[in-house]
Amino acid sequence: TLVNTSFYWDNLIHFGMGPKKGPDGVLAITLPMADKRLSGIAAEDIGKCVYGVFKGGVANVGKTYGIAGEHLTGAQMAAALTKALGQTVRYNAVTPEQFRGFGFPGAEDLGNMFQFYAEFEDYFTGARPLDVARRLNPELQDFATFLARNAGRIPLG
């Protein structure tokens, strides 16, 4: 049995992917996703979905589950962050090449990951139907709910 996850929204808290102030003082999130949707999920919901798989017993043996809480563009994520944080957050779209060149540990791997997500958006999001995750975890959070619970934990750079 396989559970295929999505981008962890917790990366905004723990991995330095939260909004950063630009030269004009306005916050922005930077992703190489152009106008493509990114499947995302709260880390705690991954565990709850896996628990749902286990609760299903032998009926779930050998199955593959793709899970996500929501599929959002970078602009939609920025709008949700703006609402949750009470200050403007822009979406800064960069190319995968630019992202890989940022020079932090893992930038190349993340750039490759995001490039795959963007270039194969329909495949990636289609393999993560929201109703499947919600069936496994009836408490599944969408991005707005995640932000309502965690906005104060997101470091603003």
Predicted features and spans:
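A hydrophobic C-terminal alpha-helical subdomain
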Residues: 60, 96-157
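Oxidoreductase cofactor-interface core, primarily capturing Rossmann-like NAD(P)-dependent enzymes
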Residues: 1-90, 99-108, 151
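Conserved residues in the N-terminal Rossmann fold of short-chain dehydrogenase/reductase
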Residues: 93
